[in-house]
UniProtKB/Swiss-Prot annotation:
Record's miscellaneous remark: RTL5 is one of at least 11 genes called Mar or Mart related to long terminal repeat retrotransposons. They do not correspond to functional retrotransposons, but rather to neofunctionalized retrotransposons genes.
Coiled coil region boundaries: none
Acidic residues: compositionally biased ranges: 78-90, 393-432, 439-450
Domain of life: Eukaryota
Xref: Pfam families: DUF4939
Descriptive protein name: Retrotransposon Gag-like protein 5
Region (Disordered): 77-97, 116-139, 377-450
Length: 599
């Protein structure tokens, strides 16, 4: 008896579990039917609005009746005995709780509306075929029935079909890979991508692709492997002359980096160029964004490292695609076009300093002008890029026309080496000329920061001392006159630098290194000079070398004035470099032979 009771309980539990599963399936069936009814009702309402302008035939609407469901309601109704058992064991779980949203329409009302939908002549539409089988109801495509309606129709790209010529294979695959990458939503699986690629094949290439990608083959749904097989099948050979022209015309444009790199490497295998030349050609074909970012990157060893560096840049600058959500049609962005512009005419934006008036920069920016600038900016960028591409193409065409008919790569490499050597020699000559010009300019205009050391004999020193004592007073007046003229030329009459003459220190033990710096002992209590902020840079042009050996006597001699013609016919006053101190061979040592000491 105990075994029979146990078997009965197990059977009863199994029956209850099966009944729960049956109820759940019936509920899912009804929910799917209601979702389909809502979608069809929305489509019919939209078409009804358009029917007043365009005479379209009325659509066929399915009637959601009881005979269209997989499980009939009268067949699954429980008997009174089963109802008693369910009340004792588990509650009956069939219908979900009713929704309380104010905008929600009840399911019964929706079914009645769809059933009452008739044609204008009064005849009701015939019902559709029964609903699909149970496995199809649980497919993921039916769980999201509104996802397909949101995808816009895909336009076929304007790409020339491929007939099997390996010369055009690289550019053909680059364009198609970019198009598929830009429209990933339309190609969710590999089979769709393979079929889309085969649709652009013609002739023998189409026959080969169809035979290779039949159902059951490994290439039917493997898009990357199918691309590799295409490159192996139509690998050439390509003449080096043709490959050279093709790789020079290859430009990335709006294509992805991966497709451009694959196309470039496919053509590079037919050339005998060295790695440096391949890198230069690869950079010429890159888009402007990558070339700008590569300026901040480190040096690369070969072409593979250059491609990897570009891949890193692509990950940084790539704009993530926004996933299309079901039921969301209008996404707001800061600069989206607003259809009703009259409402936004009064909306204004002010700058941060609007209270200071228009003279201080408080200008008003309107939304309408902002939207126009935002729409015009990409167009200007595209036009500039197109102009740059046209100029590059013209330059390359001129280079191709000027080239010799002999396309042997050894001779080309030799010519390139000779040209590079000539360019390097010219650059070196230009640099030498620039250095000479800079030295001459420095000698003319920038020798105020230099200290000239002259080697004098003991007899000449005494004569020099006498001459210097006589001309001290005259040179002081000339020095003051030069400063007034310079201030008058620059319009800085009120900004003259007031400096007191430094007191010389008789310290024979002071070295050059300690005397060059701006130390307090060089002034001996003299107050620092008072100067304007705009004249602060002038203080670095006056080296304090009063404490050097041999400078205790009045050896300082301002140079004579030099007159230079200005840009506008004005006469400018400029002083030659001044001799601040002189050294004898005994005092100068090894520095006296060089002739100059830079400060």
């Amino acid at each position: 008896m105990s075994e029979a009771a146990g078997n009965l309980n197990s059977l009863r539990l199994a029956n209850v579990a099966l009944r729960e599963e049956l109820n759940a399936l019936r509920g899912e069936n009804v929910q799917l039917g209601l979702q389909l009814g809502r979608a069809l009702a929305e489509v019919n309402s939209l078409r009804g609005n358009v029917s007043s302008y365009i005479r379209w035939p009325m659509p066929i609407v399915p009637v959601l009746a009881e005979e269209n469901f997989e499980f009939l309601l009268n067949e699954t109704d429980p008997t009174p005995e089963e109802e008693e058992e369910e009340e004792e064991e588990v509650p009956f779980l069939c219908w979900p709780p009713p929704r309380t949203d104010p905008e929600y329409v009840s399911d019964d009302l929706l079914i009645n509306v769809v059933q009452d939908y008739t044609n204008p002549d009064g005849s009701s539409d015939p019902p559709l075929s029964p609903s699909p089988s149970q496995p199809e109801l649980h497919s993921p495509m039916l769980k999201e029935p509104t996802f397909e309606f949101l995808l816009p129709p895909l336009e076929r790209p304007d790409i020339e079909p491929f007939s099997g010529d390996p010369v055009y294979l690289a550019e053909f695959l680059m364009q198609l890979e970019t198009f598929i990458a830009d429209h990933e939503d339309h190609f969710p699986g590999g089979a769709e991508r393979v079929a889309f690629l085969i649709s652009f094949f013609t002739g023998e290439a189409r026959d080969w692709a169809i035979s290779v990608t039949q159902e059951g083959s490994s290439l039917h749904a493997n898009f990357p492997r199918f691309l590799d097989e295409i490159r192996k099948e139509f690998c050439g050979p390509i003449p080096s002359r043709v490959a050279k022209k093709a790789i020079r015309k290859l430009k990335q444009g709006n294509c992805t980096l991966g497709s451009y790199a694959d196309a470039f490497q496919f053509l590079a295998q037919f050339l005998s160029w060295d790695d440096c030349r391949l890198q230069n050609q690869f950079l010429k074909g890159l888009s402007e964004i990558f070339r700008k970012e590569l300026l901040w990157s480190t040096e690369v060893a070969d072409l593979d490292e250059l491609i990897l560096e570009c891949v890193k840049i692509e990950r940084k600058v790539r704009v993530p695609k926004t996933a299309s959500l079901t039921g969301v049609q209008n996404s707001c962005c800061p600069f989206a076009l607003i259809p009703n512009e009259d409402e936004n005419e009064g909306v204004e934006f002010y700058s941060e300093n609007e209270g200071e008036g228009e003279e201080a920069g408080g200008y008003r920016l309107y939304l309408k002008d902002q939207r126009q600038h935002m729409t015009a900016f990409p167009q200007e960028m595209r036009e500039e890029e197109e102009e740059m591409r046209k100029e590059e193409d013209e330059m390359e065409d001129e280079e191709d026309e000027d080239e010799d008919e002999d396309y042997e790569f050894e001779e080309e490499d030799e010519d390139d080496d000779d040209e590079e050597e000539e360019e390097e020699e010219e650059e070196e000559e230009d640099k030498e000329e620039e250095m000479k010009n800079e030295d001459s300019d420095e000698n003319k205009y920038e020798e105020e920061d230099e200290v000239i050391v002259r080697v004098l004999e003991p007899e000449q020193e005494q004569e020099r001392e006498e001459i210097e004592h006589e001309h001290v007073y005259v040179h002081e007046h000339i020095h003051a006159h030069v400063h007034t003229l310079a201030a008058h030329h620059h319009g800085l009459h009120g900004e003259l630098m007031v400096m007191d003459e430094p007191v010389l220190v008789d310290t024979s033990t002071q070295t050059i290194s300690s005397a060059i710096g701006y130390h307090a002992e060089n002034y001996l209590g003299v107050s620092p000079s008072v100067m304007h902020s705009s004249r602060q840079r002038s203080q670095n042009r006056v080296p304090l070398l009063e404490g050097l050996p041999g400078t205790n006597s009045s050896f300082y001699s301002p140079p004579p004035l030099m007159r230079h013609a200005g840009r506008l016919g004005q006469r400018q006053m400029r002083r030659c470099p001044s001799v601040l101190f002189c050294l004898t061979p005994r005092q100068g040592g090894h520095r006296a032979t060089q002739g100059r000491i830079r400060v």
